[in-house]
């Protein structure tokens, strides 16, 4: 999300008084971070003495994590964002742009990079794909040895430039940029408190901005501890990367909802990214995940680690393996490709059916379909061809024209389908309307039978950890039985991946995943659900800012010549 331009810098007085304006900026600066080729991990206790209340060190290495959105057009879960951080490479910004290319599937509506050169932070952000935002001329404006980057996916109305990350802030005492993958479930209450108690002025509609306001109001020293203190107020899902004039910092939430990995290039440069596919592209060797609750600090002295908040049971997002991550990534210590292949094999074992061919809804259903076909002993063929040139913004006022949307994206191969009993494997069903169109498309192409197999359990609850899902009332699996859904979409049979079999596949790691979208049981209760539980219709977040003038007691009213009332004391 892009910082708003032409805003005042935070003054020393504004830090202590509740009238503080926020120091967002969108103008370039620079910053040159010194670098040490240190391939060993320094003492992890080295930061503990700086904390006013020592934090527990040594996070559990089993912890790891994700982010997301549901598209009104194809109704698939959409990854809300991806993050990258690089320290110690003279080509940091260019490597950052390449890594963002690898993470493009996690967000297509905006991209940004902040680089550090000569003790200045400089930003380039834009709306669109990475290739559109970062042509060579823009990358040449981002010299330096450290950088962070972000790709964003948002719902309609939130794609404006000011919401494109990384966010960049100038404080009186330092400058910092942040990129965020996740969602703060206590964002509204934090923002209300900051506005009411500190006079904070927000410049975006993003929850990420609250982090920078928390840093501004923190009383901790040195600056690194302001970041740590700010993160201690956050609840929900977050994988954060920060860059300052001399440091690269990564923070992962205690539950490890969102993934964040660390690697190294051969020159010793440290790389942080949402997925290992980004490391692979820029020839960085995977080292490990950033543990849930861990803070990683990279500077010229090396790498330091401390634990923000430890948690005995991580709650990593299972949908990372079902849909979000690329198949060539390793997420939460598991191969995404192998996970999806196993999902398909389980479907073939648990829900077999007589068929002639197995096809996939491309691209996310392909690997599960391969697993299904191999287990069932039935040939896999490419029965649907996906067009990669149709944007999600294809919206027409006429329903008759709008119905062409699926046909624009998916074209049936008649030679594969005609007269065949077809098993079609997809990753999920959300509202069900797209599935019904796919079934109709296949039957119109000559399929004798269409059997839908879904490589995840039924989605019955909304996600509050970085995914813009429909309300529970809109989720078809929350309203209908499997048989009712089958009739609705028009398939000859329908089966989902059983949740208990999914957990069995995960083995000892099963307790370390979040299944809230399948069960409605949330590891961290969102504010929206708290309101429902307490019987509160809504919280008054605006503090009556837009209240009636007549209710303001200012010692009487006077009227000017135009009849406009002015308060007088």
Curated annotation (Swiss-Prot):
Q: Tell me, which GO biological process terms does this entry list?
A: 'de novo' IMP biosynthetic process; purine nucleobase biosynthetic process; purine nucleotide biosynthetic process
Q: What is the lineage of its organism?
A: Eukaryota, Viridiplantae, Streptophyta, Embryophyta, Tracheophyta
* Active-site residues (renumbered): 81 (nucleophile)
- What are the Glutamine amidotransferase type-2 domain coordinates in residue numbering? 81-301
What does the entry list as the binding residues for Mg(2+)? Answer: 364, 426-427
Q: Which named protein is this?
A: Amidophosphoribosyltransferase, chloroplastic
Which residue intervals make up region (Disordered)? Answer: 1-51
Q: Which organism is it from?
A: Glycine max
Pfam families according to UniProt: GATase_7 (PF13537), Pribosyltran (PF00156)
- Which InterPro entries does the entry mention? GATase_2_dom, Ntn_hydrolases_N, PRibTrfase_dom, PRTase-like, PurF, PurF_N
Q: Which keywords annotate this record?
A: 4Fe-4S, Chloroplast, Glutamine amidotransferase, Glycosyltransferase, Iron, Iron-sulfur, Magnesium, Metal-binding, Plastid, Purine biosynthesis, Transferase, Transit peptide
Reaction it catalyzes: 5-phospho-beta-D-ribosylamine + L-glutamate + diphosphate = 5-phospho-alpha-D-ribose 1-diphosphate + L-glutamine + H2O
Pathway connected to this protein: Purine metabolism; IMP biosynthesis via de novo pathway; N(1)-(5-phospho-D-ribosyl)glycinamide from 5-phospho-alpha-D-ribose 1-diphosphate: step 1/2
Protein EC: 2.4.2.14
Which CDD domains does the record associate with it? GPATase_N, PRTases_typeI
User: By its UniProt entry, which PANTHER family does this protein fall under?
Assistant: AMIDOPHOSPHORIBOSYLTRANSFERASE
Question: Could you cite one Gene Ontology molecular function of this protein?
Answer: amidophosphoribosyltransferase activity
Q: Which PROSITE patterns match?
A: GATASE_TYPE_2, PUR_PYR_PR_TRANSFER
């Amino acid at each position: 999300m892009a910082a708003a331009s032409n805003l005042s810098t935070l003054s020393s007085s504004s830090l202590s008084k509740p009238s503080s304006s926020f120091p967002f900026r969108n103008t370039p600066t620079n910053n040159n971070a010194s670098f040490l080729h240190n391939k060993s991990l320094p003492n992890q206790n080295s930061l503990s003495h700086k904390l006013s209340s020592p934090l527990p060190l040594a996070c559990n290495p089993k912890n790891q994590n994700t982010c997301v959105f549901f598209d009104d057009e194809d109704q698939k879960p959409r990854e809300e964002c991806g993050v990258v951080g690089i320290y110690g490479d003279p080509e940091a910004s260019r490597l950052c742009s390449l890594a963002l290319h690898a993470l493009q599937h996690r967000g297509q509506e905006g991209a940004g990079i902040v680089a550090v050169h000569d003790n200045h932070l400089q930003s380039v952000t834009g709306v669109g794909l990475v290739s559109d935002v970062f042509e060579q001329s823009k990358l040449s404006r981002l010299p330096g040895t450290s950088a962070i980057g972000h790709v964003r996916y948002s719902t309609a109305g939130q794609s404006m430039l000011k919401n494109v990350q990384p966010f960049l802030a100038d404080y009186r005492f330092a400058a910092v940029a942040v990129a965020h993958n996740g969602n703060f479930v206590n964002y509204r209450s934090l923002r209300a408190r900051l506005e009411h108690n500190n006079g904070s002025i927000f410049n975006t509609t993003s929850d990420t901005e609250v982090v920078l306001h928390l840093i501004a109001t923190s009383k901790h020293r040195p600056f690194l501890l302001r970041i740590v203190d700010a993160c201690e107020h956050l609840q929900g899902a977050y994988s954060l990367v920060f860059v300052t004039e001399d440091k690269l910092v990564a923070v992962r939430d205690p539950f490890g909802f969102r993934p964040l990995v660390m690697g190294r290039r051969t020159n010793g440069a440290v790389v942080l990214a949402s997925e290992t596919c980004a490391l692979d592209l820029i020839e960085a060797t995977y080292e490990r995940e950033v543990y849930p609750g861990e803070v990683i600090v990279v500077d010229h002295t090396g790498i330091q680690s401390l634990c923000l908040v430890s948690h005995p049971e991580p709650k990593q997002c299972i949908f990372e393996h079902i849909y979000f991550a690329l198949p060539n990534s390793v997420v939460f210590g598991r191969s995404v490709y192998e996970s999806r292949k196993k999902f398909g094999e389980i479907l073939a074992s648990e829900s077999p059916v007589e068929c002639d061919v197995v096809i996939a809804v491309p691209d996310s259903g392909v690997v599960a379909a391969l697993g299904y076909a191999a287990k069932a002993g039935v040939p896999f063929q490419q029965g649907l061809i996906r067009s990669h040139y149709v944007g999600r913004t294809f919206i027409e006022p006429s329903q008759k024209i709008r119905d062409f949307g699926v046909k624009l994206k998916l074209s049936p191969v008649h030679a594969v389908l005609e007269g065949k009993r077809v098993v079609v494997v997809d990753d999920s069903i959300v509202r069900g309307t797209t599935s019904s169109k796919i079934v109709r498309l296949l039957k119109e192409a000559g399929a004798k039978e269409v059997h839908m197999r879904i490589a995840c359990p039924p989605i019955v609850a909304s996600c509050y950890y970085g995914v813009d899902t429909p309300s529970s009332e809109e989720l078809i699996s929350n309203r209908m039985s499997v048989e009712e859904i089958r009739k609705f979409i028009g398939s000859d049979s329908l089966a989902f991946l059983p949740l208990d079999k999914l957990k069995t596949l995960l083995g000892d790691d099963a307790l370390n995943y979040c299944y809230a979208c399948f069960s409605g049981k949330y590891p961290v209760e969102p504010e929206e659900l708290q309101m429902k539980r307490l019987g509160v219709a809504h919280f008054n977040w605006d503090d009556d800012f837009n209240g009636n003038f007549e209710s303001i007691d200012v010692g009487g009213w006077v009227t000017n010549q135009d009849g406009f009332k002015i308060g007088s004391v």
